[in-house]
C-alpha cells in the first residue's frame, strides 16, 4: 500500500499537468524540447556524412560507402524503436490510469530486452557486415570504406540501443528537456570529435565511426543515470528486470509498426541502391545517400512533434479524457502540415543548397539537384502520415499501425522501385526515384481514410467504458 500511495503522490504532483494544462501550451512545452532533440539528432546522424563528403580526394566514394552502411544502421535503430517506442506509450497509458507499478514493470522489461537484442546485433553486424554491404549495393570502389565504418560502428550497438530506446521512456513521462539533453550531449561530442578523428588523426571513415560510438556512449550514460535515479517518476529497478511474456509481448506488438517503418527502410535502401547501381552507377547511389539525409531532415522534426504529443494523448486516453485526446491530435496535425509544406517549398526552390551541404563534388551536386525534386515531390503531405501514425501508437492501436506501415513500404514502394523504370524508359534512373512520391501519395490517402474511421471508434469506446 505504501508503494502504491507513493506512486500516486508522484503522479498527482508531477504528471497532473498532462490532464489539466491548456493543450496548446502543453504541446509547446513538450514538443519544443523534443523537436529540438530531433533536430539535434538529425545533425548527429548526418554530421559524419558532411565531413566524410569533404575528405580531400576520396570524399565522393567515401560518402557513397558510408551511405551503403545506412541499411544496417537503420536496422539497429529499428530494434530500439521496436522496444522503446512500443513500451513507452503503454507506460504512459498506465500512468494515466495511476498504475505506476505496471508502468515500471514495462520499463524494466524493455531495458532487459534491449540489452539482449544489442548483444545479438553486435555479433551479426561485426562478423557479417561485408556480406550484407555487398548485397546492399556496395561496389568494388566503395566496399572498403563501408566495411571500415561498420567494423567500428557495430561495436557501439548497445549504446545506440539504450540511448534511443530508453530515451523514449524519459520523453513519455513528460521530461522533454531531459530527453533533449540526452541527444544534445551526444551531438556536441560528435561534432567536436569528428574533425579531430577524420582529419587531424587521418582516420577517415573509421574516425567518423569512432566519434559516433563515443558520443553515443556519453548519451547512454546520461539516459541510464536518469532512469536509475530519483528524479524519474518511473525508475529501472532490479525486481522488474526479469522478462515476462505478458509484459514484453504487448510492447513489442505496439512497437512493431515503427520497427517495420524503420527496418523496412533498410530493405528499401537495398532495393533503391541495387536498382540505381544498375541504371545510374555510383553517382546515383551517392545521390541516394544525400536524398536519405535530406529525408531524415524532413522526417525527424515531424517525429519530434509526434513524440511531444504522444505523452499527452496516451495519458489522457488512459484517463478517458476524449476531448484532450482529440484536441491534441488536431493541433499536432496542423503543426505537422505547416512544417512539411514549408520544407517542401524550400527543397523545391533550393535543391542545390541541400545537396551542397553533403558534398563538394559538383557533378554529384548537379545530379542530386534534379533527383531531389523528383524524390520529395509530395513531401508536403508527410504531416498527415506522421500525425496519424503517431496517434495510432499513442492510443495503443498496434494492428492499425502495422497495416499503415506495411501498406506504404511493402505493398507500394518496393514494387514501384522496379516497376517505374519500365514505365518511364527515357530516364530510368529518375524513374527509380519517382517511386517514392507515387507510393507516398497513395499511402497518405489510405492512412487518412483508415485513421478517420479508427480514431472515431477509439474515442467512442472509451466514452462507453
Regions of interest found by a model, annotated:
Residues 84, 153-171, 182-187, 208-221, ...:
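Short runs within selected transmembrane alpha-helices of multi-pass transporters and secretion channels
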Residues 43-46, 54, 60, 94-97, ...:
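Helix-loop interface residues and adjacent transmembrane-helix termini in multi-pass membrane transporters
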Residues 63-123, 160-179, 287-351, 382-404:
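Small-residue-rich hydrophobic transmembrane alpha-helices
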Residues 34, 38, 50, 89, ...:
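Transmembrane alpha-helix boundary and packing residues in multipass membrane permease domains
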Residues 41, 45, 49, 53, ...:
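Juxtamembrane/transmembrane-helix interface segments of polytopic membrane transporters
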Residues 35-89, 153-160, 249-316, 336-344, ...:
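Transmembrane helix-bundle signature of multi-pass secondary active exporters and lipid flippases
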Residues 139, 175-176, 204, 281, ...:
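Short loop-to-helix capping motifs
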Residues 1-31, 91-156, 200-255, 313-378, ...:
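Short alpha-helical transmembrane segments in multi-pass integral membrane proteins
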Amino acid at each position: 500500500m505504501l508503494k502504491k500511495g507513493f506512486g500516486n503522490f508522484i503522479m498527482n504532483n508531477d504528471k497532473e499537468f498532462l490532464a489539466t494544462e491548456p493543450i496548446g501550451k502543453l504541446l509547446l512545452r513538450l514538443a519544443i524540447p523534443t523537436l529540438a532533440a530531433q533536430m539535434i539528432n538529425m545533425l548527429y546522424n548526418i554530421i559524419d556524412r558532411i565531413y566524410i563528403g569533404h575528405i580531400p580526394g576520396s570524399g565522393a566514394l567515401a560518402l557513397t560507402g558510408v551511405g551503403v552502411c545506412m541499411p544496417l544502421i537503420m536496422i539497429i535503430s529499428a530494434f530500439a524503436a521496436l522496444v522503446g517506442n512500443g513500451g513507452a506509450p503503454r507506460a504512459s497509458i498506465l500512468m494515466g490510469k495511476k498504475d505506476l507499478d505496471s508502468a515500471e514493470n514495462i520499463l524494466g522489461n524493455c531495458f532487459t530486452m534491449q540489452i539482449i537484442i544489442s548483444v545479438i546485433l553486435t555479433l551479426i553486424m561485426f562478423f557479417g557486415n561485408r556480406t550484407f554491404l555487398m548485397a546492399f549495393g556496395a561496389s568494388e570502389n566503395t566496399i572498403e570504406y563501408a566495411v571500415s565504418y561498420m567494423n567500428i560502428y557495430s561495436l557501439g550497438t548497445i549504446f545506440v540501443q539504450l540511448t534511443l530506446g530508453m530515451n523514449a521512456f524519459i520523453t513519455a513521462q513528460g521530461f522533454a528537456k531531459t530527453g533533449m539533453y540526452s541527444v544534445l550531449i551526444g551531438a556536441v561530442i560528435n561534432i567536436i570529435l569528428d574533425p579531430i578523428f577524420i582529419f587531424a588523426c587521418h582516420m577517415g571513415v573509421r574516425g567518423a565511426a569512432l566519434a559516433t560510438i563515443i558520443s553515443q556512449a556519453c548519451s547512454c550514460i546520461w539516459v541510464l543515470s536518469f532512469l536509475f535515479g530519483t528524479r524519474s517518476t518511473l525508475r529501472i529497478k532490479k525486481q522488474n528486470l526479469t522478462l515476462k511474456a505478458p509484459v514484453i509481448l504487448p510492447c513489442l506488438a505496439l512497437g512493431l509498426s515503427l520497427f517495420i517503418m524503420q527496418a523496412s527502410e533498410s530493405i528499401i535502401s537495398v532495393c533503391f541502391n541495387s536498382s540505381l547501381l544498375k541504371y545510374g552507377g555510383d553517382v546515383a547511389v551517392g545521390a541516394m545517400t544525400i536524398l536519405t539525409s535530406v529525408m531524415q531532415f524532413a522526417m525527424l522534426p515531424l517525429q519530434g512533434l509526434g513524440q511531444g504529443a504522444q505523452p499527452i494523448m496516451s495519458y489522457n486516453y488512459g484517463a478517458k479524457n476524449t476531448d484532450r485526446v482529440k484536441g491534441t491530435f488536431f493541433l499536432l496535425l496542423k503543426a505537422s502540415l505547416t512544417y512539411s509544406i514549408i520544407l517542401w517549398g524550400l527543397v523545391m526552390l533550393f535543391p542545390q543548397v541541400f545537396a551542397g551541404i553533403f558534398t563538394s563534388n559538383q557533378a554529384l551536386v548537379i545530379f542530386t539537384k534534379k533527383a531531389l525534386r523528383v524524390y520529395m515531390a509530395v513531401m508536403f503531405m508527410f504531416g498527415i502520415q506522421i500525425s496519424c501514425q503517431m496517434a495510432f501508437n499513442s492510443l495503443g492501436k498496434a494492428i492499425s499501425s502495422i497495416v499503415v506501415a506495411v501498406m506504404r513500404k511493402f505493398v507500394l514502394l518496393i514494387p514501384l522501385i522496379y516497376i517505374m523504370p519500365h514505365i518511364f524508359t527515357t530516364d530510368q534512373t529518375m524513374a527509380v526515384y519517382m517511386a517514392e512520391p507515387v507510393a507516398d501519395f497513395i499511402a497518405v490517402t489510405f492512412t487518412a481514410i483508415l485513421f478517420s474511421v479508427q480514431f472515431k471508434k477509439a474515442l467512442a469506446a472509451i466514452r462507453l467504458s
